[in-house]
Amino acid sequence: MSPEQDTSPELTHFRDGLPRMVDVTEKAATLRTATAEGWVRLPPEARAALEGGTSPKGDPLTVARLGGLAGSKRTADLVLLCHPIPVTGADVRVTLEKAGVRIVATVRTTAPTGVEMEALTAVSVAALNVYDMLKAASKAIEITGVRLLSKTGGKSGDYTAPDT
């Protein structure tokens, strides 16, 4: 296949087979947003502890929301090749639904690189906090479905997950 026919995406974090941080020096700082979601599936005993307010550590949903906000700001410390960028806005919604705890995080920046990883990290850290807060009630809690719902801005353009 000739280079002009190659439609595979470029993996920008590798050069000559070695990891690298992508150079964004020449990229324009523009408004970028990303929204991610994830779920925490609760066994009956964990759900009962949440609904009954009997978690010994306090309100799991409030702690998860705060953890998600903190996670969005600490992404570059956790995701090794992620740029430390200014998070100019973050919203983490944590709701108890029939299927479990749903977490949706939206993160905004005006930077030369996107905030998809910040949104995904916010959801993941929020979910881990739900687990931590309810693990005394059940160890069978499951974190699932962490994914990017949408992104705007940047060279790659806008994205919306097909089933949203």
Swiss-Prot record:
GO terms for molecular function: cyclic pyranopterin monophosphate synthase activity. It comes from the Bacteria. The keyword Disulfide bond does not apply. InterPro entries: MoaC, MoaC_bact/euk, MoaC_sf, Mopterin_CF_biosynth-C_dom. Keywords: Lyase, Molybdenum cofactor biosynthesis. The active site is at D132. Its EC number is 4.6.1.17. GO terms for biological process: Mo-molybdopterin cofactor biosynthetic process. Substrate binds at L81, C82, H83, M117, E118. Homohexamer; trimer of dimers. This is Cyclic pyranopterin monophosphate synthase. SUPFAM superfamilies: Molybdenum cofactor biosynthesis protein C, MoaC. Disulfide bonds: none annotated. Pathway: Cofactor biosynthesis; molybdopterin biosynthesis. The gene is moaC. It is an enzyme of class 4 (lyase). The keyword Cell division does not apply. It holds the Pfam family MoaC. Catalyzes the conversion of (8S)-3',8-cyclo-7,8-dihydroguanosine 5'-triphosphate to cyclic pyranopterin monophosphate (cPMP). Belongs to the MoaC family. It catalyses: (8S)-3',8-cyclo-7,8-dihydroguanosine 5'-triphosphate = cyclic pyranopterin phosphate + diphosphate.
